[in-house]
């Protein structure tokens, strides 16, 4: 079986990691955000200070983790990463914060999932660079203050509305990541193909970009899966025909919609009036959070669904799409 990949001396994991850009100048998309971030980083370096705390928010797969890593590289400081669900008690947070050196970057993914007791400990760490820890029990309880070096907290969330106002307001640099344009996705897919040493036709790149939902993570995942089909079929190049066939087998339609998206749309189509998210969740046997994070943002972006105070409503554009593609039942 022939392979369209480069020599096997490089592991698959290494190649996949290299798909991510390592500096702001190589980051495709989010142009205004990147320009502003460059200004903030340069200003912090000029003052020899830690960068102000950064909050990255937007739908999944748009590059929040990658941006956080790039920021630490641009600042030439260490990068520590954790996530909201892993910080279940104050001691967990203290263990992370006390290992930081001056100006280091601490990245907390899914920061909206921090419980309130952890948030309260984080407030003083972010504002005053210190930790107040309760020592002892009962009447002998006392507060022990631990000083921390100035550091940069970068929080990432797909659910900005779930962050408490006090925590949200402590981020001096809130940055909203938006869906990527078709042209930006084309550039990202081309770069990914080069890193993976996969030969791909221009039309195939465009086919993937059309079905990637404006999301780099999805675009690169589809590229890797299509490459699998090509290698197994003993082909040398990813053509538009092969890409289209592979994507159809993966259940991805021309708009980038998958089975869950179509089930969601069909349910709204067959239900009269606005529908609440809890009702949709029960009907589809899907978690509310998953629907709100991974399904609805793109459907709203392409004007297939509207959110109203009374619930979700299917648009005429979506009804026409479902009818044309004969997927209503």
From Swiss-Prot:
Pfam families, sorted: AAA_lid_4, RuvB_C, RuvB_N
The EC number(s) this enzyme carries: 3.6.4.-
Free-text note regarding domains: Has 3 domains, the large (RuvB-L) and small ATPase (RuvB-S) domains and the C-terminal head (RuvB-H) domain. The head domain binds DNA, while the ATPase domains jointly bind ATP, ADP or are empty depending on the state of the subunit in the translocation cycle. During a single DNA translocation step the structure of each domain remains the same, but their relative positions change.
Protein name listed in UniProt: Holliday junction branch migration complex subunit RuvB
Binding residues annotated for Mg(2+), in chain numbering: 65
Species of origin: Wolbachia pipientis subsp. Culex pipiens (strain wPip)
Subunit details: Homohexamer. Forms an RuvA(8)-RuvB(12)-Holliday junction (HJ) complex. HJ DNA is sandwiched between 2 RuvA tetramers; dsDNA enters through RuvA and exits via RuvB. An RuvB hexamer assembles on each DNA strand where it exits the tetramer. Each RuvB hexamer is contacted by two RuvA subunits (via domain III) on 2 adjacent RuvB subunits; this complex drives branch migration. In the full resolvosome a probable DNA-RuvA(4)-RuvB(12)-RuvC(2) complex forms which resolves the HJ.
Annotated S-S bridges: none
Keywords, ordered alphabetically: ATP-binding, Cytoplasm, DNA damage, DNA recombination, DNA repair, DNA-binding, Hydrolase, Nucleotide-binding
Domain of life: Bacteria
Region (Small ATPAse domain (RuvB-S)) residue spans: 181-251
GO cellular component, one term: cytoplasm
NCBIfam families in the cross-refs: PRK00080.1, ruvB
Molecular function as annotated in GO: ATP binding; ATP hydrolysis activity; four-way junction DNA binding; four-way junction helicase activity
Positions of the UniProt region annotated as Large ATPase domain (RuvB-L): 1-180
Family matches, as InterPro entries: AAA+_ATPase, AAA_lid_4, DNA_helicase_Holl-junc_RuvB, P-loop_NTPase, RuvB-like_N, RuvB_C, WH-like_DNA-bd_sf, WH_DNA-bd_sf
GO biological process: DNA recombination; DNA repair
Family that this chain belongs to: Belongs to the RuvB family.
Keyword DNA repair applies: yes
């Amino acid at each position: 079986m022939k392979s369209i990949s480069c020599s096997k001396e490089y592991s698959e994991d290494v190649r996949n990691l290299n798909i991510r850009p390592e500096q702001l100048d190589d980051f495709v998309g989010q142009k205004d955000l990147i320009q502003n971030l460059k200004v903030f980083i340069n200003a912090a370096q000029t003052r020899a200070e830690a960068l102000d705390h950064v909050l990255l928010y937007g739908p999944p797969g748009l590059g929040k983790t990658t941006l956080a890593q790039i920021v630490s590289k641009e600042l030439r400081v260490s990068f520590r990463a954790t996530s909201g669900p892993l910080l279940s008690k104050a001691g967990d947070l203290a263990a992370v914060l006390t290992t930081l050196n001056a100006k280091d970057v601490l990245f907390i993914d899914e920061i909206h999932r921090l419980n309130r007791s952890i948030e309260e400990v984080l407030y003083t760490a972010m504002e005053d660079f210190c930790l107040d820890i309760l020592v002892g029990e009962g009447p002998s309880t006392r507060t022990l203050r631990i000083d921390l070096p100035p550091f940069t907290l970068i929080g990432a969330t797909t659910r900005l509305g779930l962050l408490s106002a006090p925590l949200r307001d402590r981020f001096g640099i809130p940055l909203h990541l938006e869906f990527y344009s078709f042209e930006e996705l084309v550039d990202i897919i081309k770069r990914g193909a080069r890193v993976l040493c996969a030969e791909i036709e221009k039309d195939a790149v465009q086919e993937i970009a059309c079905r990637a939902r404006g999301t780099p993570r999805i675009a690169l995942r589809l590229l890797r899966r299509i490459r699998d089909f090509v290698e197994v079929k003993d082909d040398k190049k990813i053509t538009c025909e092969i890409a289209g066939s592979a994507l159809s087998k993966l259940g991805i339609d021309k708009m980038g919609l998958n089975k869950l998206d179509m089930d969601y749309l069909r349910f709204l189509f067959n239900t009269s009036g606005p529908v609440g998210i809890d009702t949709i969740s029960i009907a589809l046997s899907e978690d509310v959070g998953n629907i709100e994070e991974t399904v609805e943002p793109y459907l709203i972006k392409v004007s297939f669904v509207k959110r109203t105070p009374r619930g979700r409503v299917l648009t005429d554009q979506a009804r026409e799409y479902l009818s044309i593609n004969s997927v209503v039942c």
